[in-house]
């Protein structure tokens, strides 16, 4: 009798607990539809021998003896041939696909077949004929559909993480996270539970007019010849930066930009940022030279830098949550042997010996084995099937099989290049720094994480939606790059937090400051920038729906930079006074579309500029920070949402959340901008004028300039600019502005610019302006 499919929340034995894969908070991954394939008289699938073999780049994860060499040796040596044959037979028998028909002739399909996908959802190769920004403006409906799907998954995921982290020990309260004891400043616990939900924020896709490297790319991107010529001239230009404080960069090579005006504009900004970093001798946090190594762990080797001296922690101090489970090791963190270790190791080794001759189903079999599925049942993986079919037509079957093998090779390196213990950012653990290769090993292991783990790619692979096929393109592109030409450097993940009393002191010191400098960019997108802090419109669970069907701002960023997914393994659900900082993530892909129209695209110059090696710091990290801050979800009519947002507790909560994120780098970054946009709007129904004002206050508290990307809403941006100019003319301080938005009153009917109108009323009356100088402190609000 076949055993049932693994169900979420099923009781597990102590032995199974030892083998748990990546665990923690996050989304539950529903199990794929369980179907048997129709049996036929045929044996294993046969593949055409006429496929031309493309020349391959060297794979850095391939052992000194390649699979080809192994197979050639086996032809000459009967003993080797017998061993390889046995390995192949064992793997194939486990899946029991000897009687399964060829992939090309599968007759039983899910409701959405590959052919249906091709006919109803074309690849939209000519999407650049319409501005990506226009697409994003009309994507609220897509956002809400995705949001509704993920709301249920988040609730299920919280239950899953409770099951996975079940432990007899009573966990000690984490030091360093001070709980609020009053409700004057913050939303009460019950309000937080109902107000803070997943974030699917509307942002535009990347600009469609990319500058191509040849005429073909130029035609696809819609870039004119004049723009290419202008960008080429700018690309040839370099600026010598002379500084006595640092030699980090002697020349700045300008990256291509997607449009002529943007290229020139951004070149000027980039030069300013370089000068600010060099003259200020700035180091993005964590500064590994100065931080406490017992709280800030470095797991990689950095040239000319001492080995990390972080202390070894006891599991029982914080419970099992503190150590990231490593299912691929022979022993767990408590020294207990994993009986399944050799089984999984043999499966990976066996697959890599015969993947070229056994085809697509061998990779499916490997996944089934690693997921511990019933060997008598074949589970459908529609997205993987569609990816295999589509890419085989484009690059050839052999290359697609090689892509699968690269994932397995990188996953195998985890045991060798990762430390025995990786501490999650709980308790007093503040940060973790890993190399690009270590990040790749962790992400590759997510392919083989069991479906009951919140951090498994099983949900993507088993989906029948075309968006998941696009996600696989992002992921396999990442592993291709990491196999062929991996970047050399490191990435830091840090939990930044502040207790209530400390924040109140910060506010008292800074509420008399003038408003910060604010610049508006109608065309530039957040991901077009470098040498700055980029805002991630985050979910309280980092990564949002990237492992499901989510495909808006945060998910797109994580697909462009898959290393960010490591943060999902390390971080728990964000609390009210927390933000998550990621420093040094590399960009591997570009994109077009947004939401359900998202498409993978080759890496373009406007996105690759932050990968410039000259921008790396002494620890090997790229000088760019992504700061994840989650906003409140508002529900109801437009009037209900607007009224609820003007509640003082909600204004204070959003201002604190943004301020803590913007202050993540400390007081020295006064010339390094924060690049943001309509945070908390879109599917979260945020009031755009109010969210803009809140971010202005937060940037002022952090004493940093604000670069605001309006995402194709120039009229609204013009109103934002006008109100800022008026307030500066009136010498409005941060405290005065905070007082204004806290005393706007409630609207009788919805009006988009209600907040701006109320501020204008204050500014028009000198008496009101003077009276607002006696601004109440945040602690009394």
Swiss-Prot record:
Chemical reaction(s) catalysed: [(1''->2')-ADP-alpha-D-ribose](n) + H2O = [(1''->2')-ADP-alpha-D-ribose](n-1) + ADP-D-ribose
GO terms assigned for molecular function: poly(ADP-ribose) glycohydrolase activity
Signal peptide: none
Annotated effect of mutating residue 536 to N: No poly(ADP-ribose) glycohydrolase activity in vitro
Region described as Disordered: 28-87, 102-131, 206-232
GO BP of this protein: ATP generation from poly-ADP-D-ribose; carbohydrate metabolic process; DNA damage response; nucleotide-sugar metabolic process; regulation of DNA repair; response to gamma radiation
Basic and acidic residues compositional bias, start-end: 106-121
Organism domain of life: Eukaryota
Tissue occurrence: Expressed in head and tail neurons. Also detected in the central nerve cord and motor neurons.
Cell location: Nucleus
InterPro entries (UniProt xref): PARG_cat_C (IPR046372), PARG_helical (IPR048362), Poly_GlycHdrlase (IPR007724)
Record EC number: 3.2.1.143
Family: Belongs to the poly(ADP-ribose) glycohydrolase family.
Name this protein carries in UniProt: Poly(ADP-ribose) glycohydrolase 1
Organism: Caenorhabditis elegans
Lineage: Eukaryota, Metazoa, Ecdysozoa, Nematoda, Chromadorea
Gene this protein is translated from: parg-1
């Amino acid at each position: 009798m076949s055993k049932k499919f693994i169900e979420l929340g099923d009781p597990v034995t102590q032995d199974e607990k030892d083998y748990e894969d990546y665990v923690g908070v996050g989304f539950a991954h529903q199990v794929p539809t369980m179907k048997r394939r129709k049996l036929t008289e045929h044996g294993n699938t046969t593949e055409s021998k006429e496929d031309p073999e493309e020349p391959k780049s060297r794979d850095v994860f391939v052992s000194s003896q390649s699979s080809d060499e192994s197979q050639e040796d086996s032809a000459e040596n009967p003993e080797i041939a017998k061993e390889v044959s046995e390995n192949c037979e064992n793997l194939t028998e486990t899946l029991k696909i000897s009687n399964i028909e060829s992939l090309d002739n599968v007759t039983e399909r899910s409701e959405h077949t590959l052919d249906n996908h091709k006919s109803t959802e074309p690849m939209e190769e000519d999407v650049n004929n319409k501005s990506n920004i226009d697409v994003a403006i009309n994507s609220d409906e897509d956002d809400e559909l995705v949001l509704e799907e993920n709301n249920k998954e988040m609730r299920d995921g919280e239950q899953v993480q409770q099951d996975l982290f079940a432990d007899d020990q009573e966990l000690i309260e984490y030091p360093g996270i001070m709980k609020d004891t009053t409700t004057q400043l913050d939303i009460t616990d019950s309000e937080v539970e109902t107000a803070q939900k997943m974030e699917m924020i509307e942002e535009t896709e990347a600009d469609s007019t990319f500058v191509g490297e040849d005429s073909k790319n130029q035609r696809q991107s819609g870039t004119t010849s004049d723009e290419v010529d202008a960008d080429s001239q700018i690309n040839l230009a370099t600026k010598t930066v002379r500084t006595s404080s640092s030699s980090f960069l002697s020349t700045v090579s300008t990256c291509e930009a997607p449009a002529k005006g943007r290229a020139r504009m951004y070149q000027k900004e980039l030069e300013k940022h370089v000068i600010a970093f060099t003259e200020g001798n700035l180091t993005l946090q964590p500064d590994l030279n100065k931080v406490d190594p017992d709280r800030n762990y470095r797991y990689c080797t950095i040239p000319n830098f001492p080995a990390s001296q972080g202390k070894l922690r006891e599991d029982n101090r914080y419970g099992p949550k503190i150590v990231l489970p490593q299912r691929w090791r022979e022993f767990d963190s408590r020294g207990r042997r994993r009986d399944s270790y050799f089984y999984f190791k043999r499966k990976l080794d066996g697959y890599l010996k015969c993947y070229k001759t056994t085809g697509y189903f061998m990779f499916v079999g490997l996944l089934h084995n690693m997921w511990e599925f019933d060997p008598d049942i074949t589970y459908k993986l529609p997205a993987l099937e569609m990816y295999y079919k589509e890419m085989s037509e484009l690059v050839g079957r052999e290359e697609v099989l090689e892509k699968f093998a690269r994932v397995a090779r990188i996953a195998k390196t985890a045991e060798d290049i990762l430390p025995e213990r990786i501490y999650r950012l709980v308790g007093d653990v503040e940060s973790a720094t890993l190399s690009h290769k270590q990040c790749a090993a962790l992400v590759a292991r997510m392919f083989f994480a069991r479906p009951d783990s919140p951090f498994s790619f099983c949900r993507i692979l088993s989906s029948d939606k075309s968006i998941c096929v696009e996600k696989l393109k992002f992921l396999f592109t990442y592993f291709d790059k990491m196999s062929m030409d991996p970047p050399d450097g490191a990435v830091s993940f840090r939990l930044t937090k502040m207790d209530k009393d400390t924040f109140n002191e910060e506010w008292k010191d800074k509420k008399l400051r003038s408003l910060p400098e604010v610049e508006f960019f109608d065309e530039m997108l957040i991901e077009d920038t470098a040498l700055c802090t980029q805002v991630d419109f985050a979910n309280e669970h980092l990564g949002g729906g990237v492992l499901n069907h989510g495909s808006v701002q945060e998910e797109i960023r994580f697909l462009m930079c898959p290393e960010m997914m490591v943060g999902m393994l390390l971080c728990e659900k964000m609390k009210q006074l927390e933000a998550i900082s990621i420093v040094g993530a590399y960009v591997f892909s570009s994109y077009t579309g947004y939401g359900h129209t998202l498409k993978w695209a080759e890496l373009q110059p406007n996105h690759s500029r932050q990968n410039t090696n000259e921008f790396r710091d002494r620890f090997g990290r790229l000088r760019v920070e992504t700061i994840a801050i989650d906003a409140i979800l508002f529900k109801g009519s437009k009037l209900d949402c607007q009224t609820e947002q003007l509640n003082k507790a909600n204004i204070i909560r959003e201002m604190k959340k943004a301020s803590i994120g913007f202050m993540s780098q400390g007081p020295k970054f006064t010339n390094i901008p924060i690049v943001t946009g309509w945070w908390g709007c879109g599917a979260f129904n945020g009031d755009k004028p109010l969210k803009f004002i809140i971010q202005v206050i937060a940037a002022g508290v952090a004493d940093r300039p604000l670069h605001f990307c309006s995402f194709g809403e120039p009229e609204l941006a013009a109103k934002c600019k006008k109100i800022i100019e008026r307030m500066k003319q009136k010498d409005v301080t941060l405290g005065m502005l905070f007082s204004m938005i806290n005393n706007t009153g409630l609207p009788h009917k919805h009006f988009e610019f209600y907040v701006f109108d109320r501020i204008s009323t204050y500014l028009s009356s000198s008496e009101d302006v003077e009276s607002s100088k006696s601004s109440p402190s945040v602690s009394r609000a």
